[in-house]
Amino acid sequence: MATTNTIEGVNLHRRCFFGAAAVSIAVSQFGMMGSAKAQSDETRLSAIKPGAHTSFGPLKQIDAGLLNVGYAEAGPGDGPSVLLLHGWPYDIQSFVDVAPLLASAGYRVIVPYLRGYGTTRFLSSETFRNGQQSVVALDIIAFMDALKIEKATLAGFDWGARTADIIAALWPERCKALVSVSGYLIGSQEAGMAPLPPEAELQWWYQFYFATERGRVGYDKNRRDFSKLIWRQASPKWDFDDATFDRTAASFDNPDHVAIVIHNYRWRLDLADGERKYDDLEKRLAEGPVIAVPTITMEGDANGAPHPDPAAYRNKFSGRYAHRTIKGGVGHNLPQEAPQAFAEAVIAADRV
């Protein structure tokens, strides 16, 4: 059974302790139980077993910026908005159990496919298939504009956490609160060129593979087997079945998937150019901007993917902050492996 170890708040609570008491503890850990309003806003979450849900309702599509974005939506249309952002090699299925939990708590939950995944498509065949970090964040800003969402709680992991971090840092007026797995993930090409200790470099083996033409062709040819290998390495204790993987892997059939993934990782190493029109944004991100919105960072105790130590990024968050380590063999795909803990963090971060 997974447990949550929380820094800067109550020390420990069991993830199986659900219902109003669980949310009460989650909120108090974030230092928000001092007011009568906070206490009256407690929400009862139903207990959920990871993997209880296998699909969303009918997907929606909307033109937003350079894309026609595919997305799932749950919960009341007039509820406070929460955007859940996935990473690589994952998709919206990472939140298939989180979304109904948050919807039952009254949130409008929106889960988009990032560029290069699922049913999201470029509006023009002429658009450069760019995977650099600032562009993915701009996609989400355009998506929020298209849905007329002025401000939302943003929560994600991997690419999704980085995207949420960027929006919180550069456009804090659009981000009510932040939940970021593995913390502060904003990077730069300069930082990406710095050598790491050998063991750390080994964890990034796929990035160096993608730097070669052989790697691009190999990923294109073997994207499902490749992604399943990454799942196993990133979440070594997660006993997912083939059906769970296959539901996500269908998203990798997107015609732009390989181009976006390869460009993303080559751009990080300064082996591929971005677009000049985004240079100013990248310069700002390279400065490592501090995030001031209320934030909860999270980490699984069995994350086999490269990730920073929480102490290394603590000073990157200047507002209300807590860190939660989710124990019990939880790996990189934290929302899908520990949906209850992730949903609790979203509610706690939102209720400042």
Task: Please provide the spans of the model-predicted regions.
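Conserved HGGG/HGGXW glycine-rich cap/lid loop of the alpha/beta-hydrolase fold
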Residues: 74-119
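C-terminal segment of classical bacterial N-terminal signal peptides
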Residues: 28-35
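C-terminal alpha-helix
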Residues: 345-352
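Flexible "cap/lid" subdomain of the alpha/beta-hydrolase fold that forms the substrate-access gate
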Residues: 41-57, 66-69, 74, 81, ...
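Boundary at the C-terminal end of the N-terminal hydrophobic targeting segment
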Residues: 36-40
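N-terminal secretory signal peptides
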Residues: 1-16, 23-26
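Conserved beta-strand scaffold positions in the cores of enzyme catalytic domains, especially
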Residues: 59-61, 109-111, 323-325
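Catalytic histidine-centered segment of alpha/beta-hydrolase-like enzymes
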Residues: 330-338
